[in-house]
Every structure is written in structure tokens, then in C-alpha cells.
């Protein structure tokens, strides 16, 4: 566990666990196939993604703040890590460079539309497309450590525009919800067109 004021770094703990697994394998006290399976999990990209999400969520809190705020950040980081362990639609951290050409994606949704904020389009040849980390259908959870869950569309746009140098996004892939949103918006547009005619 990190001391007060230290950032949480789980990578060291995971490496130590792998070392201990290797010692156990050499001892022959535990069936090797179980130890090897656990070692594969700890060394997997998935475990690394869960660790990154946990650390990112934990780091969004001011360490010098009250114990209650730190406990809340730890709880949120734990929930994010458990959500990631579900395997499907787990949160991911995506970093994109911010240049004059923009970020190369569009968003839709927001509190005013009673929906989460989603990546609705990846612009072909743009930064997001070249980077490859974002997908159409990703729900935008935070921008540079600021949550956009339950926020207005404009707040997310402002955070993305204000970012300098690079943008750190936490996203979760949920394409079905985006499809439902787009279908709902299309029905609303069709109803409006019928009213105008």
C-alpha cells in the first residue's frame, strides 16, 4: 500500500507476486498448472489495463485532501478495476496528442439528451484514427481526470478543447447503447420532419 502522498503503483506489487509464484513453482508444493495460469493472468494485457485504470482513477484525487476524499477515490478506483475485470466493456485509458489538427473524433450525447457521451465518429486519417486507441461506440467517462459522466455535451467539448499537449481519456466500449441512441435520435428527426411537412 502506498504511503500518504505517494502515488499508487501496483506494477511493483504485481512483479513481486510473479516472483513469489516462480518460487512456489520451484518448490513443487502447488500444482504447476494452477501457478502458471495465475502467472499468465498477472502478465496479461488485460491485467495491465485494469491496473492502469485503477491507478488513473486513484490519481485524480488530491492526495493532500481529507481522508474521506481519499477513501472515496480508493473506492472509485476499486469499482473501476472490478468493472474492468468483467472483461466486456471495461474502462480503458487512451492518451492522444493534442495538435492544431484537433483530436480526430466527434462526440454525441450528454445530460441534456438524457444519455451518456459517446464517440460517434472517428475521422479517417485523423489523430484518433492514426493512434488506434479509440473506437466508435466508446463511452467517454473522463477527460484529463475530470469525469464527464452525467454531464452536458458542452462540458465535454470544453474539456477537450481546453486540453493542451496531450489528452488522457478514460473510455468504455458499449456500442449497443450508441446504436440505441442513434436509433432514438433518428426517430426524433423523422418525427420532426413529419411535423414540418
Swiss-Prot record:
Membrane topology recorded in Swiss-Prot or TrEMBL: Peripheral membrane protein
Domain PDZ: 93-175
Residue ranges occupied by any L27 domain in the UniProt entry: 10-65
Domain of life the protein comes from: Eukaryota
Subcellular location: Cell membrane; Cell junction
GO terms assigned for molecular function: protein-macromolecule adaptor activity
Segments forming a coiled coil: none
Primary location recorded for the protein, binned into one broad class: membrane
GO biological process entries: exocytosis; neurotransmitter secretion; protein transport; regulation of synaptic assembly at neuromuscular junction; synaptic vesicle transport
A Pfam short name: PDZ
Gene Ontology CC: one annotated term: cell-cell junction
Motif, Kinase interacting site: chain positions: 1-13
UniProt keyword list: Cell junction, Cell membrane, Exocytosis, Membrane, Protein transport, Transport
CDD domains: PDZ_Lin-7-like (cd06796)
Similarity section: Belongs to the lin-7 family.
Quaternary organization: Component of the brain-specific heterotrimeric complex (LIN-10-LIN-2-LIN-7 complex) composed of at least APBA1, CASK, and LIN7, which associates with the motor protein KIF17 to transport vesicles along microtubules.
PANTHER family: PROTEIN LIN-7 HOMOLOG
Function: Plays a role in establishing and maintaining the asymmetric distribution of channels and receptors at the plasma membrane of polarized cells. Forms membrane-associated multiprotein complexes that may regulate delivery and recycling of proteins to the correct membrane domains. The tripartite complex composed of LIN7 (LIN7A, LIN7B or LIN7C), CASK and APBA1 associates with the motor protein KIF17 to transport vesicles containing N-methyl-D-aspartate (NMDA) receptor subunit NR2B along microtubules.
Domain remark from Swiss-Prot or TrEMBL: The L27 domain mediates interaction with CASK and is involved in the formation of multimeric complexes and the association of LIN7 to membranes.
Name the UniProt record assigns to this protein: Protein lin-7 homolog C
Amino acid at each position: 500500500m502506498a504511503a500518504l502522498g505517494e502515488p499508487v503503483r501496483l506494477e511493483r506489487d504485481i512483479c513481486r507476486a510473479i516472483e513469489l509464484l516462480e518460487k512456489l513453482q520451484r518448490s513443487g508444493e502447488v500444482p504447476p498448472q494452477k501457478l502458471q495460469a495465475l502467472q499468465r493472468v498477472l502478465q496479461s494485457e488485460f491485467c495491465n489495463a485494469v491496473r492502469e485504470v485503477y491507478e488513473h482513477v486513484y490519481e485524480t484525487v488530491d492526495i493532500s485532501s481529507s481522508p474521506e476524499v481519499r477513501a472515496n477515490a480508493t473506492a472509485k478506483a476499486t469499482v473501476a478495476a472490478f468493472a474492468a475485470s468483467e472483461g466486456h466493456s471495461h474502462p480503458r485509458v487512451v492518451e492522444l496528442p493534442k495538435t492544431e489538427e484537433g483530436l480526430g473524433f466527434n462526440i454525441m450525447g450528454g445530460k441534456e439528451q438524457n444519455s451518456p457521451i459517446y464517440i460517434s465518429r472517428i475521422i479517417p486519417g485523423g489523430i484518433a484514427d492514426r493512434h488506434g486507441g479509440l473506437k466508435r461506440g466508446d463511452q467517454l467517462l473522463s477527460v484529463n481526470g475530470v469525469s464527464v459522466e452525467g454531464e452536458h455535451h458542452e462540458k465535454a467539448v470544453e474539456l477537450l478543447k481546453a486540453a493542451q499537449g496531450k489528452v488522457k481519456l478514460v473510455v468504455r466500449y458499449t456500442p449497443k447503447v450508441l446504436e440505441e441512441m442513434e436509433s432514438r435520435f433518428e426517430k426524433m428527426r423523422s418525427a420532426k420532419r413529419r411535423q414540418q411537412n
